[in-house]
């Protein structure tokens, strides 16, 4: 046979063999049992970051199309971080008997480019002050490595600053908004970042705002909605004020949604239309819930009736029946009604009043309860450290019926408390960044002391109570993918004072406790404390936690993607008074847990160990006596929502 014919046949055979490779691979379901990254020169990112960019993980089924897409994603990841000349080679090895595959990615990172210069076009007509504020934005900087995400962040922050200072139509040019110019040579290389803006040459002002209520069957007053608008006609346009106005209107219970849109083509003075959609006025909702009360975890539910426009003016009336269960000895039943009035005295203040009657089974006694809680909330600002102030006035009539005696104690409790709150956390249910801080001071017994002579069958307590709660959250994605570091600190102090024939010590329901699902998790509820009787609580609390939280299966598309893990250390204790506090009596707990994310929060289980128990005279440390570890130094905790 002619040599050329032999050559053609060889090419055809090799081509058919190559084309049959995907068919051979897909004929069986191979599981990826090993994935390796190797580097020809440098390694900048760890394997977890590369695996996340690739989107392929060990124990996945091998899919050639997915591998191809993953390699494209890996190249994009490198490109977005300034590695414009990166290359990757791939090799496969198969074990037909075990039906497994090993993947090897050979990466040449090559040069990582730095930013040589940053040029802004279209901002030459800004005021000197606004120009200075924009040039102080430093998400990207000269001589720092190129990073696409940081360039987007820089651009968005500049646009926000422009649109919050009158330049309503500011934007990047559609055809050439962001220009990246790469240059390289023997002695110098880098990228020029050029951001081309338009619409930053003419100031816009708010014009009139028309409020349109769709299907206003409840005759909702437009002036009620207008009070929530945070700008006036003639003010310089601010996107931030427009969005805040939308949020404020939508917060009214009767409102389902609110959108404020420009209503005129004028650049200088822009009229607006607030389109408001109402929700149903009446609502009855059953619910289930889990909560921690005095360190015990309760589960239960109830039903709530709400009138979202009670007597007009944005007022809300709600009625609840609520039952909670921990055990046959610990359970609660409450009926309550709450009235809420927005714009109380000031636009930023809200008044609410809650009446409650309840029956509570507690450790060693029963409570029959009737109480009234009046609260004034004042919103200060998102820009100040303290965002909100709360003033609470609480009056309670409580009867204690003790299980082991026939004696009855009647208490008239009244307390006024001022609380300041800072909260910039990014999520109510599961924060991943931000800081929460509250500090409160309260005084109990002032009103009872004035009227107690008219209530000869009642007793009261006099004390002041100080408390601060703090939580900080850090997103560790850049260090440990899909991870959060969280820490908390709580300090509380009760100082009793006063004399009188009807004066009694502070009752347990107003004291501090240690141990439990939201406390030191190596102890069961109320089992920790430097106290003669831990179930009666103490007057001084110091307690905190540090916790590492991580998504365990971030790549999964099934139910497993909602499973999270946690490692924690808890510390603290409760004492009779602050004068008895000692550092060597601070207890330590450690352990691990799992969470499953649901729409209402995480369902949580924690396994806690008593790392250091100051009350155990024979084996203070966990491993002092290994035989005790699973007998007296271990606790299982359940909860809904994170521990803090």
Predicted segments, located by residue:
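Bacterial N-terminal signal peptides that target proteins for export
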Residues: 2-12
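Gram-negative/organellar outer-membrane beta-barrel architecture
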Residues: 125-130, 235-438, 521-522, 531, ...
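Periplasmic polypeptide-binding modules associated with outer-membrane biogenesis and secretion
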Residues: 27-292, 303-304, 316-336, 469, ...
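Strand-loop-strand
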Residues: 583-598
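Bacterial N-terminal signal peptides
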Residues: 10-22
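Hydrophobic, well-ordered secondary-structure elements that form the walls
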Residues: 249, 305, 339, 470, ...
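Outer-membrane beta-barrel domain signature
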Residues: 63-65, 94, 147-149, 165, ...
């Amino acid at each position: 046979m002619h040599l050329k014919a032999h050559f053609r046949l060889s090419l055809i055979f090799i081509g058919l063999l190559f084309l049959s490779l995907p068919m051979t691979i897909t004929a069986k379901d191979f599981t990826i049992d090993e994935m390796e990254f190797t580097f020809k020169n440098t390694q900048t990112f760890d394997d977890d970051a590369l695996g996340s960019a690739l989107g392929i993980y060990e124990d996945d089924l091998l899919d050639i199309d997915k591998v191809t897409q993953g390699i494209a994603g890996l190249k994009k990841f490198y490109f977005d971080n300034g590695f414009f000349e990166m290359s990757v080679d791939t090799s496969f090895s198969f074990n037909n008997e075990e039906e497994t595959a090993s993947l090897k990615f050979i990466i040449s990172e090559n040069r990582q480019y730095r930013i040589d210069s940053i040029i802004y076009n279209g901002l030459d007509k800004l005021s000197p002050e606004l120009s200075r504020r924009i040039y102080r934005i430093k998400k990207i900087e000269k001589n720092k490595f190129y990073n696409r995400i940081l360039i987007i962040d820089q651009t968005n922050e500049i646009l926000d600053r422009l649109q919050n200072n009158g330049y309503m139509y500011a934007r990047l040019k559609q055809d050439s908004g962001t220009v990246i110019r790469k240059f390289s040579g023997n002695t110098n290389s880098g990228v020029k970042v050029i951001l081309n803006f338009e619409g930053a040459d003419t100031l816009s002002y708010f014009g009139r705002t028309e409020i349109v209520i769709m299907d206003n069957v409840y005759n909702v007053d437009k002036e009620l909605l207008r009070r929530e608008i945070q700008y006036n006609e003639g003010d310089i346009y601010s996107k931030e004020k427009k969005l805040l106005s939308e949020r404020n209107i939508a917060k009214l219970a009767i409102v389902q949604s609110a959108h404020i849109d420009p209503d005129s083509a004028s650049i200088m003075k822009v009229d607006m239309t607030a389109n408001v959609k109402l929700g149903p006025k009446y609502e009855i909702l059953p619910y289930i819930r889990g909560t921690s009360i005095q360190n015990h975890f309760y589960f239960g539910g109830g039903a709530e009736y709400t009138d979202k426009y009670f007597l007009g003016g944005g007022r809300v009336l709600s009625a609840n029946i609520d039952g909670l269960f921990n055990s046959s000895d610990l359970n609660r039943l409450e009926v309550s009604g709450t009235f809420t009035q927005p714009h109380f005295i000031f636009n930023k203040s809200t008044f609410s009043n809650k009446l409650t009657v309840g029956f509570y089974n507690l450790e060693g006694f029963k409570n029959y309860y009737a109480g009234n809680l009046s609260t004034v909330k004042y919103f200060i600002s998102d820009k100040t450290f303290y965002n909100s102030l709360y003033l609470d006035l609480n009056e309670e009539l409580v009867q204690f019926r003790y299980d082991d005696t026939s004696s009855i104690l009647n208490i008239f409790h009244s307390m006024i408390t001022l609380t300041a709150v800072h909260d910039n956390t990014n999520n109510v249910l599961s924060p991943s960044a931000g800081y929460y801080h509250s500090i409160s001071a309260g005084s109990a017994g002032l009103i009872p002391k004035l009227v107690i002579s008219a209530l000869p069958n009642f007793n009261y307590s006099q004390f002041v109570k100080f408390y601060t709660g703090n939580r900080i959250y850090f997103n560790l994605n850049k260090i440990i993918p899909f991870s959060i570091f969280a820490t908390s600190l709580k300090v509380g102090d009760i100082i009793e004072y006063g004399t009188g024939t009807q004066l009694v010590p502070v009752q347990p329901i107003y004291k501090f406790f240690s141990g439990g699902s939201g406390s030191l998790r190596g102890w069961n509820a109320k089992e920790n404390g430097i106290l003669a009787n831990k179930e009666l609580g103490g007057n001084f609390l110091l307690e905190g936690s540090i916790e590492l939280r991580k998504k365990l299966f971030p790549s999964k598309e099934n139910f497993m993607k909602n499973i999270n893990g946690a490692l924690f250390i808890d510390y603290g204790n409760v004492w009779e008074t602050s004068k008895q506090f000692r550092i060597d009596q601070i207890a330590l707990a450690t352990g691990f847990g799992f969470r499953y994310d649901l729409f209402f929060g995480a369902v949580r289980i924690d396994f806690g160990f008593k790392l250091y128990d100051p009350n155990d005279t024979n084996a203070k440390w966990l491993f002092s006596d290994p035989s005790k570890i699973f007998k007296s130094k271990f606790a299982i905790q359940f909860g809904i929502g994170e521990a803090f």
